[in-house]
């Protein structure tokens, strides 16, 4: 993701637009930028395998989106989820392209990028579910949560 977004923007992908939008808005509030990348099913061809259920290395084309499709394989169907790809924003090295220094960031090393965003989004979702008296699933999908099947 750092090839296309550099060191100032985190890539975000997922299957639930309301969740993605909440994370993007939380990032705006916390001064951490995000850019949504596609999860087109056509990218799945890059992770097909002839010897396993799925291949974890999809090759160079659409690498970031392909990696997110790999993660999607392990998420239960109809579960809202999002992935923040912090490859470019997680670490400050000696690279001069890392021009996004903020007063709370170290000169070098781990940035903690998106910790503030995720914490803010969780707080926002908790407040929204309390105000609407609904589950997170209902908030994000507009559907009532399905009761769990008894064993």
Regions found by a protein language model. Give the residues of each.
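A generic structural signal for tightly packed, nonpolar segments enriched in small/aliphatic residues
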Residues: 1-151
């Amino acid at each position: 993701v750092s090839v296309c977004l550099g060191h100032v923007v985190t890539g975000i992908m997922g299957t639930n637009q309301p969740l993605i939008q909440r994370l993007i808005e939380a990032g705006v509030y916390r001064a951490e930028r995000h850019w949504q990348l596609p999860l087109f099913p056509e990218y799945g061809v890059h992770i097909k395998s002839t010897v396993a259920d799925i291949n974890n290395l999809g090759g160079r084309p659409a690498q970031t989106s392909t990696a997110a499709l790999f993660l999607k394989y392990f998420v239960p169907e109809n579960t809202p989820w999002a992935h923040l790809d912090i490859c470019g924003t997680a670490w400050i090295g000696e690279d001069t392209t890392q021009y996004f220094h903020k007063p709370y960031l170290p000169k070098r090393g781990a940035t903690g990028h998106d910790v503030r965003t995720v914490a803010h989004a969780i707080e926002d979702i908790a407040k929204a579910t309390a105000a609407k008296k609904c589950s997170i699933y209902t908030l994000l999908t507009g559907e009532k949560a399905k009761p769990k099947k008894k064993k």
